[in-house]
Amino acid sequence: MLNRVAVLSDIHGVLPALEAVLAEPDVAAADLIVLTGDIAAGPQPVQVLDLLAGLGDRVCWVRGNADRELVEARAGRPSPIEVSNWAAGQLRDDQLERLATLPLTVTLEIDGLGPVLFCHATPRDDEEVVLVDTRMARWTEVFADLPAGVRTVVCGHTHMPFTRLVDRRLVVNPGSIGMPYGGPGAHWALLGPGVQLRRTDFDVDAACARVAAESTFPDAAGFADEYLRSRHSDADALAVFAPRDGR
């Protein structure tokens, strides 16, 4: 059983934000780091994957839709997102192979929480949308096939941190490391024996300048300005995601 698990989601290829979180004492001391998807689709994909791969067995990887789309883009099925197509072209074959073999879900035993299921969007789909205010009937549908013993589900995908109870199950979204909605900073979670939503502050100006200088993505500066500065509010994001939540 694991005592402490750090959950990092939606890094989106932003190296300075990832480095800031990995430098957190509680992340460094965690028994395991779980990545809940959308790891590399961004301006520094190779560097992010190399840094995480270098941590070896301390990292548990889960597939996100953007990870799948990188593999698809490299295979000739382009993404509608420009940075994803660019990132797919940067990755080495070994990195693509890693992304291609990531699981949709992982279940781990954590002190105080029991079996915890980790996924990117939902346990059954890597791009399905659920939100903090999703209707109970929809949550019931989404969780219909979960084992009864799984009382905690950790997801990502929407880049907005929350915790809520869903018919006696705890749902945790750690938010996003590299593309936060609602405010700057790198958002993550610490599990065991309870649940803590965390935010790591870092020098956003310096991070934006570094991404612009080090990435060869043509609009690296624009990407960094838009996402590291969190130009999109949580209200903006909820308005975009709501129709995909069946509303």
Regions found by a protein language model. Name each.
Residues 7, 61, 153, 171-173, ...:
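Conserved beta-strand scaffold positions in the cores of enzyme catalytic domains, especially
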Residues 77-82, 112, 116-148:
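Active-site-proximal segments of metal-dependent phosphoesterases and phosphodiesterases across multiple
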Residues 3-100:
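Core catalytic region of metal-dependent phosphoesterases/phosphodiesterases
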Residues 133-172, 186-188:
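Anionic-ligand binding region
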Residues 165-247:
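Acidic, His/Gly-rich catalytic cores of divalent-metal-dependent hydrolytic chemistry
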Residues 25-29, 55, 110-112, 146-149, ...:
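Glycine-rich phosphate-binding loop signature in dinucleotide/nucleotide-binding domains
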Residues 12-17, 41-43, 66-71, 126, ...:
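Active-site environment of divalent metal-dependent phosphoester hydrolases
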Residues 1-6, 107-117, 166-170:
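Beta-strand-turn-beta hairpins that frame and shape the catalytic cleft
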